């Protein structure tokens, strides 16, 4: 039974590692999602400013600066979206790994429980045999006394 316990401990450690790795990737995903939201808000602000500048007489350099900045923000959003997509795939992979390690741990847990049940059954069988033996001896003693 000790081997099953050792294997279960190892499986628990692997499960905990997989869980930690999944948490890290999820945190990165949330961080990138937050960054994307902030970048989108900033791009929308620049878009509104650019629309206002184009309706009013403004310096061409200001308009050009907003256009350039807006393109850079759009390029940044594209890169962030690519990173989010990569992290989504990574989350899926980590979730599968966590599920696999949890199933492995549960397998060893069931083996340990089965081993304990067998030990209990063996112990009960020993007790039953001992009681049967005592009953037989008492029966013979009663017969010999009679």
Give the ranges of each region predicted by the language model.
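Charge-rich amphipathic alpha-helical interaction elements
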Residues: 1-146
């Amino acid at each position: 039974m000790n081997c099953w316990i050792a294997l279960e401990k190892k499986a628990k450690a692997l499960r905990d590692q997989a869980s930690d790795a999944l948490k890290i990737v999820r945190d990165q995903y949330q961080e990138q999602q937050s960054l994307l939201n902030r970048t989108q808000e900033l791009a929308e602000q620049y878009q509104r400013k650019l629309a206002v500048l184009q309706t009013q007489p403004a310096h061409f350099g200001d308009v050009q600066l907003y256009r350039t900045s807006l393109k850079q923000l759009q390029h940044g959003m594209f890169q962030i979206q690519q990173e989010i997509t990569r992290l989504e795939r990574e989350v899926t992979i980590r979730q599968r790994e966590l599920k696999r390690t949890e199933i492995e741990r549960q397998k060893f847990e069931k083996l340990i429980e089965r081993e304990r049940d067998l030990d209990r059954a063996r112990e009960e069988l020993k007790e039953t045999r001992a009681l049967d033996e005592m009953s037989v001896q008492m029966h013979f003693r009663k017969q010999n006394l009679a």
